From Swiss-Prot:
Lineage: Bacteria, Bacillati, Mycoplasmatota, Mycoplasmoidales, Metamycoplasmataceae
Family indicated by similarity: Belongs to the UPF0154 family.
Disulfide bonds: none
Membrane topology: Single-pass membrane protein
Transmembrane region(s): 8-28
Protein name: UPF0154 protein MYPU_1460
Any one GO cellular component localisation term in the record: membrane
Family annotation (InterPro entries): UPF0154 (IPR005359)
UniProt main location, coarse: membrane
Keywords carried by this UniProt record: Membrane, Transmembrane, Transmembrane helix
Protein's organism: Mycoplasmopsis pulmonis (strain UAB CTIP) (Mycoplasma pulmonis)
Pfam families referenced in this protein's UniProt entry, alphabetically: UPF0154
Localization terms from the record: Membrane
Length: 75
């Protein structure tokens, strides 16, 4: 086994493992992100309306938009 062959094999396997690691990391991250979105969905106007109705308050459109703005600024 020559030195050139050994170096080429090491470099080739390193690149291969790097690519495989990147693909695995992509899918793991994607799965975790989807799980987080499923457990904690983003709040929308419909959810805010439902929250106000549960509190027994009839919210105006301006109040709902104000709550949405405050939620976005809090991020």
């Amino acid at each position: 086994m020559s030195i050139g062959l050994a170096v080429g094999l090491i470099v080739g396997l390193s690149i291969l493992f790097f690519i495989i690691g990147g693909v695995v990391a992509f899918f793991v991250t994607r799965r975790l992100f989807q799980k987080q979105l499923k457990e904690n969905p983003p709040i929308n106007e419909k959810m805010i309306r439902a929250m106000f109705l549960q509190m027994g308050v009839k919210a105006s459109e301006s109040r709902i938009r104000q709550v949405m703005r405050s939620m976005q600024q809090a991020k």
